[in-house]
């Protein structure tokens, strides 16, 4: 049966290609560009240059092509977030789980963005990054601090990840493929 399933999956991949478009947003130094690099190449670098404006990268995983918009997190770029989040398959909000000092700003920026009617119903994936660092929040603490339970107009999920160690990156990709707006 395994050979038959493999053959069917191969045939499906030839005829049923899926495309997704994602916006990666979050405050500066949360790890958005590192996430793009880990998803695209499996590689991680300690030396990241802050994103100025945005970068776009296409990545293919199996039969799914993912277009990733990596948006700058500095205050001067946050006004662009809404524009790049309209009509995407999902919004990926990256939070530095080891930086409690920025959580209130991060929560405020996320909730302000999601209050825009143009973004109603777009699935949200919140990623607590840098769980490899001491003092990183738990999933429950991050969910509470970010007020995620109050977001009821869309599908919301939270994963704790480490781009540095590639922790939970495969689960993130699986969730995105299964729950993105385009696959509903």
From Swiss-Prot:
It is found in: Late endosome membrane; Lysosome membrane; Cytoplasm, Cytoskeleton, Spindle. GO terms for biological process: cell division; chromosome segregation; protein transport. Transmembrane segments: none annotated. GTP binds at residues 29-34, 48-51, 70-74, 129-132. GO terms for molecular function: GTP binding; GTPase activity. InterPro entries: Arl8a/8b, P-loop_NTPase, Small_GTP-bd, Small_GTPase_ARF/SAR. Belongs to the small GTPase superfamily. Arf family. This is ADP-ribosylation factor-like protein 8b. It comes from Arabidopsis thaliana.
